[in-house]
Amino acid sequence: MFIDSVKITLASGDGGKGAVSFRREKHVPLGGPDGGDGGNGGDIIFVCDNNTHTLVNFKGKRELRAQNGAGGMGRNKNGKKGENLELIVPEGTQVIDAQTNEILLDLTKEGQRELFLKGGKGGLGNTHFKHATNQRPDYAQPGIKGESRLVRLELKLIADVGLVGFPNVGKSTLISVVSNAKPEIANYEFTTLTPKLGLVDVDEYNSFVMADIPGIIEGASGGKGLGLAFLKHIERTSFLLFVLDPMRQMPLKEQFIVLRKELEKFSNELFGRKFGIMISKSDSVNLGEEFAEQITLNINELENYLKEINNPQSFLIKVSSLEKTGLKELKFMLLEEIKTLRNNK
């Protein structure tokens, strides 16, 4: 199950209370204080792990707490520190204050560890309060309470390439043939209901991560279709690949314009992201000479429009995932773009 947003209360452990204790030995009837200190409460720590791809482990949990520190004991024995609670999250997880929407942590790198809530300090035992005018203090400190915070965990997938297109244009088929991802593929809209990540091996030494985002429809930036729930996943992709389908009733030019407008409404930064264009289902030209001519005119109209707006795309390529034509060229084109972006960071 893919879960990319949860609300939960997190709490670090309370400090253990200090002990009130006195030495009791056979020949020392009125021994001095020997109360040990309470142990510190456990911390809340976030750990980023790229073997985890969803927040499903947090689903249905209202609160998670680290262990409290143990109380101090006699003979100056200190209480044990409470165990830390380590929360394993995928790359791309943000920890957000649920009340102010402030981003508190942004976990983007494998192995990243972040202390989020410090456990409460253990109280001092009565040993610490002995002084000249009070040789037998009968009090100790309570432990300090741990911290508590209501947060929202939001997952934004991190990928090198994000596929952008209407539903059922061939994105899932593409990622299934170029990567190790195996999405559901069928001839109906919104087959992809959750984002999918796939590792694309270009050659023996080079690879990149591709994200198949559920199809975007006009009005997605306002919440239509699968809307905002998945547009956010494109935000963390370095390069966008628009997948346009010549078999749709909407011309290629119009598909491109609508998709770009939805990205612009959602995020100006996303609108300015580098991108390429892939014409999918290029095998559809086999449906007859007249249909092939229509597709050629459709592509020419798109190319003329791109010239009018000064060719903002990095490339335009025709691909057939079914016949596996253009795939090798596409992978190398994407790799070159990704290498350039990585070098410019």
UniProtKB/Swiss-Prot annotation:
Family: Belongs to the TRAFAC class OBG-HflX-like GTPase superfamily. OBG GTPase family.
Needed cofactors: Mg(2+)
NCBIfam families reported in the protein's UniProt record: Obg_CgtA, PRK12297.1, PRK12299.1
Domain of life: Bacteria
Domain called OBG-type G: residue spans: 159-339
Keyword Nucleotide-binding among UniProt keywords: yes
UniProt: Mg(2+) binding residues: 172, 192
Lineage: Bacteria, Pseudomonadati, Campylobacterota, Epsilonproteobacteria, Campylobacterales
GO biological process: ribosome biogenesis
Functional summary from the UniProt entry: An essential GTPase which binds GTP, GDP and possibly (p)ppGpp with moderate affinity, with high nucleotide exchange rates and a fairly low GTP hydrolysis rate. Plays a role in control of the cell cycle, stress response, ribosome biogenesis and in those bacteria that undergo differentiation, in morphogenesis control.
CDD domains: Obg
Gene Ontology molecular functions: GTP binding; GTPase activity; magnesium ion binding
Localization per Swiss-Prot or TrEMBL: Cytoplasm
Chain sites annotated for binding GTP: 165-172, 190-194, 212-215, 280-283, 320-322
Gene3D superfamilies: GTP1/OBG domain, P-loop containing nucleotide triphosphate hydrolases
Gene name of the encoded protein: obg
Enzyme's top EC category: hydrolase
Protein name per the record: GTPase Obg
EC number from the UniProt entry: 3.6.5.-
Pfam family, one: MMR_HSR1
Main location: cytoplasm
Keywords from the UniProt entry: Cytoplasm, GTP-binding, Hydrolase, Magnesium, Metal-binding, Nucleotide-binding
This protein's GO CC annotations: cytoplasm
Oligomer and partners: Monomer.
Domain Obg per the UniProt entry, residue ranges: 1-158
